[in-house]
Amino acid sequence: MLRTITPSEMKRVETRVMRETSITGEALMQNAAAHVARAVRRRMAGRAGLVVCLCGTGNNGGDGLAAMRILMEENPAFRGECWLLPGRLSADAQRELDRLTEAAGSPPRVAVHRIEGIFPIPEKVACAVDALFGTGLSRPLEGAARTACEALQALAEAGVPVVAVDIPSGLNGRTGQAFSPCVRADRTITFQYLKTGMALGDGLDVAGEAGVADVGFPAFPEDVF
C-alpha cells in the first residue's frame, strides 16, 4: 500500500537521511530533478516551443533549475526560460542556478529572469514547470509569488501541460486545501512518499496525475514517521 505522510513527517525523514546516511542534499536534488526532467520530456512530446520553469528561492526552485539543466544537456535543441521569485536563493538553489547559467552558453539556451511586476507569458510554450513552493505552504500566495502562480494558471487554461515539483504551488500539503490562486497541474512528481494534501480535498483535483519518485531514501522503521 502506498504510504502517505505529512510535510512535517517528510521533514523528519529527510533530517534522518542526512544525519544517518552518506546521501547528500545535492544527490537528493539531482535524483529529484532527473524524475522531473523525465516527466517534462513526456509531457512535451510532439509539442513545439519553450519549456518555462517558474522557480521559488528554496530547494523546490533548486529542483526546477536542476531539471532544466538536465533537459538542456540531454537535447542540443532544447530551449527554455527560468523565472525566479525575488529574494536570496538557498545554497542548493544557488548552486543549481550557477550550474545552469554556466552550461547554458551564449546566447543562453535557457534564459534566466527575475519575476518583477507583471509576468510576461512567452509565446509557444510546450510545457510549464511549477517549482515555486514545496509542501510547507500554509497560507495564500502574495506579491510576485501570486503573480507567478496566476501565470501558471493562465498557461494551463491555454492548454499548456504543467508539471508540478513535489506538490502544486498553492496547495496545503497537510490538509489538501487549495488556496487562491493554486496551480492546477497535469502531472505532479512528488518525492519518496505521497503527501497527505494530495490525497485529500482539493488535492485530489489540482495535483493531476500524481507520481511518487524514489529519490534514494533507505527503508526506515515505522517509528521514524
Annotate each PLM feature.
Residues 1-73, 77-85, 185-188, 193-225:
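Small-residue (G/A/S/T)-rich helix-start motifs and N-terminal tracts that mark the onset
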Residues 2-5, 125-225:
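YjeF_N-associated NAD(P)HX repair module
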Residues 37-134, 140-165:
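Nucleotide and nucleotide-moiety/phosphate-recognizing core
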